[in-house]
Design a protein with these regions (language model features):
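Hydrophobic pocket/interface hotspot
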Residues: 62, 73-75, 82, 98, ...
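A solvent-exposed, acidic/Ser-Thr-rich amphipathic alpha-helical stretch
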Residues: 57, 71-123
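Bacterial N-terminal signal peptides that target proteins for export
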Residues: 2-16
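Exposed beta-sheet edge and beta->alpha loop/turn motif
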Residues: 131-162
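Short beta-strand edge/turn micro-motifs at domain boundaries
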Residues: 34, 127, 151-179
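A mature extracytoplasmic/lumenal domain signature
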Residues: 118-120, 132-134, 172
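Short, low-complexity N-terminal intrinsically disordered segments enriched in polar/charged residues
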Residues: 31-76, 80-81, 184
């Protein structure tokens, strides 16, 4: 096991995770209820609590943007100079890229939901394993859906600066998604 992560008892780890999630919540309970909470949270030993909380909050805001399509959350999560380090062909760089991707996905899968299965926080990085689900009832690149289920994963690595996502490296299970949409064999 890396020296960065010291083993802790299950109860200690759960209490630490709960405290970090609670510390990362927005000021009011109503706002807190609206943010996606990671199913599993791992924070590197020795990371200052304030830094960890800010990083968790940025990642939760961005995860909730993908869950809801609320562009205000993307604007709050992403730095003004946000850079997509694995920019797909044809996607705009910076904030316009994820906003357009979300619109495209929601046009195809209006009931799209996103859960944060795992979140790992270390240094200035946050790794998230996201799980998307919904039904293809809209259209995607001219193809109409027939209600078929959509269920795919992504993994993102965020670099956080000043409490916002400055860089993102990501990989999606695109072949799985395209097969579910009926666009690939």
């Amino acid at each position: 096991m890396s020296a960065l992560f010291r083993p802790a008892g299950r109860l200690t780890a759960r209490l630490l995770a709960a405290a970090l999630v609670a510390a990362a919540l927005p000021p009011t309970a109503a706002q807190a209820d609206d943010l996606v909470t990671p199913r599993e949270l791992t924070v590197a030993a020795g990371l200052p609590a304030a830094q960890a909380s800010a990083q968790v909050l940025a990642a939760r805001r961005y995860g909730t943007f993908w869950d809801t399509g609320d562009t205000a959350l993307a604007r709050a999560a992403l730095a003004p100079d946000f850079t997509d380090r694995t920019l797909p062909a044809g996607r705009a760089q910076g904030l316009p890229g994820p906003l357009a991707a979300s619109r495209t996905m929601r046009a195809a899968v209006p009931d799209l939901r996103c859960e944060i299965e795992q979140m790992i926080v270390a240094g200035d990085r946050v790794v998230v394993h996201l799980h998307f689900r919904g039904h293809f009832t809209g259209t995607f690149n001219g193809t109409a859906g027939h209600g078929q289920p959509v269920d795919f994963i992504t993994t993102d690595i965020y670099r956080i600066a000043d409490g916002r996502i400055a860089d993102n490296w990501h990989i999606e299970a695109n072949l799985t998604l395209m097969r579910q949409l009926g666009l690939a064999n």
